[in-house]
Amino acid sequence: MSEEMNDQMLVRRQKLQELYDLGIDPFGSKFDRSGLSSDLKEEWDQYSKEELVEKEADSHVAIAGRLMTKRGKGKAGFAHVQDLAGQIQIYVRKDQVGDDEFDLWKNADLGDIVGVEGVMFKTNTGELSVKAKKFTLLTKSLRPLPDKFHGLQDIEQRYRQRYLDLITNEDSTRTFINRSKIIQEMRNYLNNKGFLEVETPMMHQIAGGAAARPFVTHHNALDATLYMRIAIELHLKRLIVGGLEKVYEIGRVFRNEGVSTRHNPEFTMIELYEAYADYHDIMDLTESMVRHIANEVLGSAKVQYNGETIDLESAWTRLHIVDAVKEATGVDFYEVKSDEEAKALAKEHGIEIKDTMKYGHILNEFFEQKVEETLIQPTFIYGHPTEISPLAKKNPEDPRFTDRFELFIVGREHANAFTELNDPIDQKGRFEAQLVEKAQGNDEAHEMDEDYIEALEYGMPPTGGLGIGIDRLVMLLTDSPSIRDVLLFPYMRQK
């Protein structure tokens, strides 16, 4: 082994060998359970101690799980067995299970996985328990669990050894069960609205659909450079061109960027597209869907996050980005007429910008540096500048802006959406402008995608599209402060 075994580990290895010597498989086979601990409690906890005595003949059960506590000496003892649904107490007596199985019980360690068959009863303190008639060792644990009273105190160890976190931390287990339910309800909502779930490539020849730095890989057989996708967008819009009018995909996206409490190099997104819709329709859909998910998973659309009550039930605020900046700073970007004027205002208000930035970039910097973190309750910010929205349709009344929105809750972006740009000539011009930005040092600027332009030339109907970061949504709905708390296996720097 790569590490020296401590005394407890050595004792467990010795017990392992003793089991082999007795002809007992310490890594047993299938065990048929009658239910989870929660099922037993739901069915039997309603009865009194006396009623359970009367019903003993009908209360035969079989449970399995991990030994989390163990106490008792002599010819009887108690333990708590933990399964996915929680814990239930077992009571093991020598005269009930026999000498051989009682020896198994006596030598069992915390962390061992056991199977118990028996009948239901209540102790003198009223705790629902299983009186063992048969005790089986299913898996011998060769390492001791973390201290039962303190669990995993090292937050980094919780992330690196998630299996230990799940064993010892009920809140973590509940978070990941709710994550699964959130994604399930998202699918239910969209499927009921007539959307079709699809799968598109994760390796792209061109990194597109978002402003981000990609991971690069190489296909040896084809001698081709490929990029792990930074967005799902462009393939889904090709499907809209092809006549699949309402599509969505839930999948992994990869961005070669920093790691923080809000960012992981690989994360989960949903993107959806609806033909003959615009960003107003998508705004309505987003609000309705998130509210539905909260109600179905949590039982309420008023959720707690970091001590704050977030009201997903009431109508969400809708605010133009220019109005949001004006409310926060007094600067009215509707009246700003040139890049130079915007740069002067940035300097006046202490906004950090790059020399190459234009009007739209500077407006966005005002928003990100002065407004974004103040948006605690659900707020749709719409009307983003054209310069930072290369795939969104221009607003017909003021072409400086696009028909785009982002959703902010607890000071974080949770969704990005727009009326899709379906004019291939305009789209090509936007890509060309992005290439200029890339040449000026913007690593996140969009590449030219001639194949996508060709698809648009066949005609894409008016379309509304949406992207939601599922990890951030799960953070919100589970009151989790870090993205690592909602990823089973987050990226960790090598030790």
From Swiss-Prot:
Signal peptide: none annotated. InterPro entries: Aa-tRNA-synt_II, aa-tRNA-synth_II, aa-tRNA-synth_II/BPL/LPL, Lys-tRNA-ligase_II, Lys-tRNA-ligase_II_bac/euk, Lys-tRNA-ligase_II_N, Lys-tRNA-synth_II_C, NA-bd_OB-fold. One of its GO terms (cellular component) is cytosol. The keyword Cell inner membrane does not apply. Its EC number is 6.1.1.6. GO terms for molecular function: ATP binding; catalytic activity, acting on a protein; lysine-tRNA ligase activity; magnesium ion binding; transferase activity; tRNA binding. Keywords: Aminoacyl-tRNA synthetase, ATP-binding, Cytoplasm, Ligase, Magnesium, Metal-binding, Nucleotide-binding, Protein biosynthesis. Mg(2+) 1 binds at E406, E413. Disulfide bonds: none annotated. Its cofactor is Mg(2+). SUPFAM superfamilies: Class II aaRS and biotin synthetases, Nucleic acid-binding proteins. Mg(2+) 2 binds at E413. It catalyses: tRNA(Lys) + L-lysine + ATP = L-lysyl-tRNA(Lys) + AMP + diphosphate. Binds 3 Mg(2+) ions per subunit. It is found in: Cytoplasm. One of its GO terms (biological process) is lysyl-tRNA aminoacylation. CDD domains: LysRS_core, LysRS_N. The keyword Cytoplasm applies. Pfam families: tRNA-synt_2, tRNA_anti-codon. Homodimer. Belongs to the class-II aminoacyl-tRNA synthetase family. This is Lysine--tRNA ligase. The lineage of its organism: Bacteria, Bacillati, Bacillota, Bacilli, Bacillales. The gene is lysS.
